[in-house]
């Protein structure tokens, strides 16, 4: 391993010990905000410190085994050669782990996220599929103990959704769900199809990190056009009495956000502004990412949200993840929320791309 990497790891080890000492300080314990921040930092350092300690131990084992080679005893020499082989193999594995653990992390990976699902080509069948995707993500969120809150929903005429926007809150939400952005295609026989022909429909999924208020882009109120209207859908008689739904248009960018899920106009406005801030930030991030990747296309984290990323083929029970040429015949499990079988390989591919970019740099 390079000396520069070893020095960085030693610095992280020292910082880990500092943080551990601070966490037992009475003043820090009394300051809940600082205690939480340090606890989070300690948790983030834990894996890399554990791997680095194991790496150091393997180095010591290798040195001891090499000393043993100088012995005259033939059995000891044989044992030493075996231990050297094991120690070198362990060092190779740990070096790979440490390289991945030291990769630059997207600071937004720990953020909550807005998940948008929109029906595309395919009419009613696309809306029904959007409903199926929403159910799939709901199951995945339940498995991860994440909270889902519907911000806006426009239901399809025959089920599902023309569009649905939800906020997902929890640990590491954006870091996992960001890989879902893109075009999702379904191939299946609709219930209304009497000939048994397979139809193809599509939905677009967009995942954006929630931007904390302190970090949010300043939005000039003069750049906003705000309309109120009566909410449609669930809500009983209430929906006919008050203009509680909100539509906000950001004039410079043309971005439009609607929120009508809350009964209070004030709450709908707050939610709409939160989604608007995330969308504007996403556009800014997209511009920057495009500039950074002008010389190198990132296979997995491609910003092209219209790009087809996945196909769900119901007759064959198959899911195809096009970005990494992954095919799984586990469609029913995936639709029930078992997304880690896809997200795990996507994350690994992303890490490999980052490592390649670092080595090129």
From Swiss-Prot:
Subcellular location: Cytoplasm
Molecular function as annotated in GO: translation release factor activity, codon specific
Post-translational modification summary for this protein: Methylated by PrmC. Methylation increases the termination efficiency of RF1.
Keyword Protein biosynthesis tagged: yes
Highest taxon of the lineage: Bacteria
Major place of residence: cytoplasm
Annotated segments matching region Disordered: 284-306
InterPro entries: PCRF, Pep_chain_release_fac_I, Pep_chain_release_fac_I_sf, Prokaryotic/Mito_RF, RF-1
Biased composition (Basic and acidic residues): 284-296
Presence of the UniProt keyword Flavoprotein in the record: no
Keyword terms: Cytoplasm, Methylation, Protein biosynthesis
An example Gene Ontology CC term for this record: cytoplasm
Modification N5-methylglutamine occurs at: 237
Protein family: Belongs to the prokaryotic/mitochondrial release factor family.
Function: Peptide chain release factor 1 directs the termination of translation in response to the peptide chain termination codons UAG and UAA.
Entries under NCBIfam families matching the protein: prfA, PRK00591.1
Designated name of the protein: Peptide chain release factor 1
Originating species: Shewanella loihica (strain ATCC BAA-1088 / PV-4)
């Amino acid at each position: 391993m390079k000396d520069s990497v070893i020095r960085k790891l030693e610095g992280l080890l020292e910082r880990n010990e500092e943080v551990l000492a601070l966490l037992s300080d009475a003043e820090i314990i009394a300051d809940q905000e600082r205690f939480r921040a340090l606890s989070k930092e300690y948790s983030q350092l834990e894996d890399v410190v554990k791997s680095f300690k194991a790496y150091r131990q393997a180095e010591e084992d290798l040195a001891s085994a090499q000393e043993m080679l100088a012995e005259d005893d033939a059995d000891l020499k044989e044992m030493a050669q075996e231990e050297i082989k094991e120690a070198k193999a362990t060092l190779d594995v740990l070096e790979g782990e440490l390289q991945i653990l030291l990769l630059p992390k997207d600071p937004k990976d720990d953020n909550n996220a807005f998940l948008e699902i929109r029906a595309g080509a395919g009419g009613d069948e696309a809306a029904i599929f959007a409903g199926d995707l929403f159910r799939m993500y709901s199951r995945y969120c339940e498995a991860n103990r994440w909270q889902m809150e519907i911000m806006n929903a426009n239901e399809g005429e025959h089920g599902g959704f023309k569009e649905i926007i939800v906020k997902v809150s929890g640990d590491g939400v954006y870091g996992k769900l960001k890989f879902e952005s893109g075009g999702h295609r379904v191939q299946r026989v609709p219930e209304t199809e009497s000939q048994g022909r397979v139809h193809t429909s599509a939905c677009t999924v967009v995942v954006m990190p929630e931007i904390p208020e302190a970090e949010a882009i300043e939005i000039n109120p003069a750049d906003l056009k705000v309309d109120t209207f009566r909410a449609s859908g669930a809500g009983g008689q209430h929906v006919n009495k008050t203009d509680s739904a909100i539509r906000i248009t950001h004039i410079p960018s043309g971005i439009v956000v609607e929120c009508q899920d809350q009964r209070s106009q004030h709450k709908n406005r707050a939610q709409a502004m939160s989604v608007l801030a995330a969308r504007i930030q996403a556009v800014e991030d997209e511009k920057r990412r495009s500039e950074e990747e002008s010389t190198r296309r990132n296979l997995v984290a491609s910003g092209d949200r219209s790009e087809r990323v996945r196909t769900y083929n119901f007759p064959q029970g198959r899911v195809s993840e096009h970005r990494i040429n992954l095919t799984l015949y586990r469609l029913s499990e995936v639709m029930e929320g078992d997304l880690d079988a896809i997200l795990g390989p996507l994350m690994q591919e992303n890490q490999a791309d980052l490592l390649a970019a670092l080595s090129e740099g």
